[in-house]
């Protein structure tokens, strides 16, 4: 009993400190010092949340910039994806993230890349095959990457300008204004947030 009592007290104290006090303190500090980041780095337009700058979205409209390839289609689905097959399975498996995980010699990887190249060239007829930036043809580890390289954004501008009626110079300024530089000038890569640039495009088009 003498050894059981201290062990029980320690367990209760640790439970309160680690399970209640510590999380509450961290939550309080984060809400005061980093409120925006602590709440998911949400992007709001006219008081309405349109997404997070940390999670990519699927854009199919020719007037908007496209993100990277996603093995989970940026976790979006259609009504058809919810229709079960003869075995009762649906195309949409619930909230998910991840990559294709194809090996370099896997024929499915080659086929997927070729299809993506052909689609991109069809949507961007002024672009040459060899000029397509690599990140537009490769999937991120999560399949939810919100960013593309400045080169990937720039190469889409002519087609977007034609579809939207927005001048190429104005689109380039939108890209420049939403480009984040390398951390400390050396860590990571310059990147463009796809949702942010598309929000600006939508504003010019009067959609939001």
Curated annotation (Swiss-Prot):
Keywords: ATP-binding, Cell membrane, Ion transport, Membrane, Nucleotide-binding, Potassium, Potassium transport, Transmembrane, Transmembrane helix, Transport
Keyword set includes Transferase: no
GO MF terms held by the record: ATP binding; P-type potassium transmembrane transporter activity
Compartments (UniProt record): Cell membrane
InterPro entries (UniProt xref): KdpC
Tagged with keyword Nucleus: no
One Pfam assignment: KdpC
NCBIfam families: kdpC, PRK13995.1
Protein name: Potassium-transporting ATPase KdpC subunit
Organism, as annotated: Clostridioides difficile (strain 630) (Peptoclostridium difficile)
Organism placement in taxonomy: Bacteria, Bacillati, Bacillota, Clostridia, Peptostreptococcales
């Amino acid at each position: 009993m003498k050894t059981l009592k201290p062990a029980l007290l320690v367990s209760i104290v640790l439970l309160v400190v680690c399970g209640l006090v510590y999380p509450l303190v961290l939550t309080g500090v984060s809400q005061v010092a980093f409120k925006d980041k602590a709440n998911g780095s949400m992007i709001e337009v006219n008081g309405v949340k349109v997404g997070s700058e940390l999670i990519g979205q699927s854009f199919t409209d020719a007037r908007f910039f496209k993100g990277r390839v996603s093995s989970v289609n940026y976790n979006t689905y259609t009504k058809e994806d919810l229709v079960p097959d003869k075995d009762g399975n649906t195309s949409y498996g619930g909230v998910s993230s991840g990559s294709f995980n194809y090996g370099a010699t896997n024929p499915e990887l080659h086929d997927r890349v070729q299809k993506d190249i052909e689609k991109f060239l069809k949507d961007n007829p002024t672009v040459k095959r060899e000029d397509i930036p690599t990140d537009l043809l490769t999937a991120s580890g999560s399949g939810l990457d919100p960013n593309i390289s400045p080169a990937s954004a720039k190469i889409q501008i002519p087609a977007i300008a034609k579809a939207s009626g927005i001048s190429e110079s104005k689109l380039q300024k939108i890209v420049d204004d939403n480009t984040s530089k390398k951390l400390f000038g050396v860590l990571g890569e310059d990147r463009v947030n796809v949702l942010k640039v598309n929000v600006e495009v939508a504003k010019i088009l009067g959609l939001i």
